[in-house]
């Protein structure tokens, strides 16, 4: 599955991704600038 994380705030955010059991997500944390988005692939 692919989740898209979008920052609608006027400041940078640092989202984190945690999966329960099994394989880990390919990206577990990152910084996202205002108005930017990133895709996270999860098992």
From Swiss-Prot:
<comment type="similarity">
    <text>Belongs to the thaumatin family.</text>
</comment>
<dbReference type="InterPro" id="IPR037176">
    <property type="entry name" value="Osmotin/thaumatin-like_sf"/>
</dbReference>
<protein>
    <recommendedName>
        <fullName>Thaumatin-like protein 1</fullName>
    </recommendedName>
</protein>
């Amino acid at each position: 599955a692919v989740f898209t994380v979008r920052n609608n705030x006027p400041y940078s955010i640092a989202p984190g991704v945690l999966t329960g059991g099994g394989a880990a997500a390919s990206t577990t944390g990152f910084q996202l600038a205002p108005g930017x988005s990133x895709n996270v692939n999860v098992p």
